[in-house]
């Protein structure tokens, strides 16, 4: 048991740090921003992995005064930036959207900031129904120690 801080830069093996967070919601739809900041506080290169984030809007049934059936759609949009530069921007209705990424983080290049913004809208300004999975961020030392792929 270690009480306090342990610092080591020549570890044999793997060190992985993971953090997860749910996207903000307003009643029936996803709406809000998650900002991830990864400090450049290590002397080795790292990789940041974002496992798949799944998001979707929806298709809704509607009947008019003559009892005629029609449909309207909820739209869910996910926008992702890396240090202020857009790397992903997609909207979807009733088909699932997916974002996933592996980002190199060389040592000495400063803090990495990822911003994930989800927004929702409904046709005719109706209240949308959308969903998005939790965000998982995995940070690891960039190394092939003990792994061979051929």
Report the location of each language-model feature.
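Low-complexity, small-hydrophobic/phenylalanine-enriched stretches
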Residues: 1-12, 16-17, 22
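Extracellular jelly-roll beta-sandwich "head" domains, especially the C-terminal globular C1q domain
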Residues: 18-150
């Amino acid at each position: 048991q270690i009480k306090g801080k342990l610092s080591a830069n020549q570890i044999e093996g793997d060190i992985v740090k993971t953090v997860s967070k749910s996207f903000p919601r307003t009643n029936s739809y996803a709406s809000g921003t998650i900002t991830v900041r990864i400090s450049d506080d290590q002397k080795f290169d790292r990789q940041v992995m974002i496992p798949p984030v799944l998001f979707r809007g929806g298709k809704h049934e509607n009947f008019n005064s003559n009892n005629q059936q029609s449909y309207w759609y909820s739209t869910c949009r996910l926008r992702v930036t890396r240090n202020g530069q857009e790397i992903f921007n997609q909207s979807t209705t009733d088909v699932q959207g997916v974002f996933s990424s592996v980002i190199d983080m060389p040592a000495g290049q400063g803090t990495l900031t990822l911003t994930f913004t989800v927004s929702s809208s409904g046709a005719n300004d109706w209240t949308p129904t959308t969903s998005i999975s939790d965000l998982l961020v995995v940070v690891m030392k960039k190394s092939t120690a003990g792994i061979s792929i051929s």
